Amino acid sequence: CQKLTDAKSAYARMNGAVARSLVRGLRHPERAVCVNIFMPCEMLHAMGLTPMFPEGLSVYVACTACQHVFAERAEVSGIPESFCSYHKTMLGMAETGVLPKPLMIAGTTLACDANQLSFRRLAALYPAPLTIIDVPGRADDDAVAYVADQLRGMTRRLEALTGRKLDEAKLRKSMACADRTLKLMREYAALRAEVTQDTTMTGELCSLIATHCLLGHADGENYVRELIETARRAPRRETTRRKRIFFIHTLPNWQDSMIRMLETENRCELVGCDLTFDSLTALDPEKPFESMARRLLTNVNGGSAARRIDNAIAWAKKLNADGVILFCHWGCKQTMGLSTLAKRRLEE
């Protein structure tokens, strides 16, 4: 095993794990499920299925410098220019035949409105089975039972499509892995608050993936363990004059101007992204579906914009950030809509 040196070494290995997962889904679409970033994937990992998600696909394609071809193809077919870039790229990949038909398409009503539109279009295009998990705006026991039953129903559909039953022991194992990963991420955040590290936008996206689509998979847990090891050896934050930046929303790792500012000019370092910390609640492996449901319901991206803003401010303070960047683009109406409120709250 290669010896760890800094956070970038952990990023590199996680990038490899994400790329292998995406390639596995492209090679074996009959064992892949297209999901949005908020969909619990522990039951997929337990069934040996690969989650394919627009954010990962689009970043992977952006590294090949051909994402514009797919975005333009989607626009020609009627997708608005102002639609989410991640989902627009994914739709263009599907309409050009590059993205094969998956076993199932599954999304949630949480936060991202683009996934409900693009996933329905994908399901009609292939055609492919579509499941949408309805996430209420409250988190009481009735809501937990309601969402848990939907997740069980999705699992039954997957069992019918694959001809294989879910192994409950494997699901509990995946849930235990997920619980450890979230606990480790909380531990890493406490360490990260006091040290300085060389960071990249792609690396922060890796952290987001580790606490979402690869949550419950060994790759996600191993990545966070590596982050902890590098943070323990990192210099104290007082040893640098770089500004510590906390990022709200996904990071545009393809944008040269942002790369220069946040990576190459050595003026700033990223200390975190709000989406990584949107739901770090403890999980009960003995109640897997209820735990997945509760994580969806307590996610700060559900409900009012104030929940997300309050959570971002709290984590920015915990991580000793000097400033916050809220990345707005046409595609994410929720993030763009909360920008003025967030600016006012951050400047108070």
How should each PLM-predicted stretch be described?
Residues 1-31, 148, 152, 156-282, ...:
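A charged, amphipathic alpha-helical module
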Residues 43-72, 246-313, 317:
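Redox- and metal-dependent alpha/beta enzyme cores, enriched for Fe-S-associated oxidoreductases
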Residues 303-347:
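C-terminal hydrophobic structural anchor segments
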Residues 33-42, 109-115, 248-255, 330-337:
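Gly/Ser/Thr-rich loops at beta-strand to alpha-helix junctions
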Residues 20, 27-54:
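TRNA-binding/sensing appendages of the translation machinery
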Residues 76-96, 300-314:
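Glycine-rich, highly charged phosphate/nucleotide-binding loops
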